[in-house]
Amino acid sequence: MESQPTFRVVQSLDDLVKAYIVRGIVFVGEQEVSYREEVDEHEHAAVHILGEIDGEPIAAARIRLLGPWAKLERMAVRRQYRRRGYGSALLRFALDEARRRGFSKFKLHAQTAAEAFYAKHGFQAQGDIFLEANIEHRLMVREQ
């Protein structure tokens, strides 16, 4: 039986590299987002999250703290670990971390293919669909 993932806020260079590996596999490799779009000027100010199973990086996300909002970004789970509830666990961890830092309003740019996933977790779609990294997205928000 496979171990369950553990999630933590990145505190070391090694953990940050692991988070970037996950993001590179998912966004640059699978979705063909350019490296220049994937890694941006907000990296240094973001709270990065890493998910691992037995030391293997399987998931990553980042949170940017923007005024009253915690913006969840770069949510990624490697393909072979999807459909096991790990994305939901990653999202819960990210929301809990933002709450721990005093935030109760959350937003994200959801890929339209993932809108139902975020809606299941209490996010509501707002506005029109827009392109980000050549992928259709929609703003989604949640309070509490």
Language-model segments: what does each one mean?
Residues 81, 85-93:
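Conserved acetyl-CoA pyrophosphate-binding loop and the N-cap/start of the following alpha-helix
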Residues 98-111:
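Conserved GNAT acetyl-CoA-binding A-motif
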Residues 50, 56-64, 71-76:
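Conserved beta-strand in the GNAT
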Residues 24-54:
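Active-site rim helix/loop that mediates acceptor-substrate recognition in acyltransferases
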Residues 65-73, 82, 132-137:
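A conserved beta-turn-beta hairpin within the catalytic core of GNAT-like acetyltransferases
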Residues 107-109, 119, 124-139:
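Conserved catalytic-core motifs of GNAT/GCN5-like acyltransferases
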Residues 1-13:
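Conserved N-terminal entry element of GNAT/NAT acetyltransferase domains
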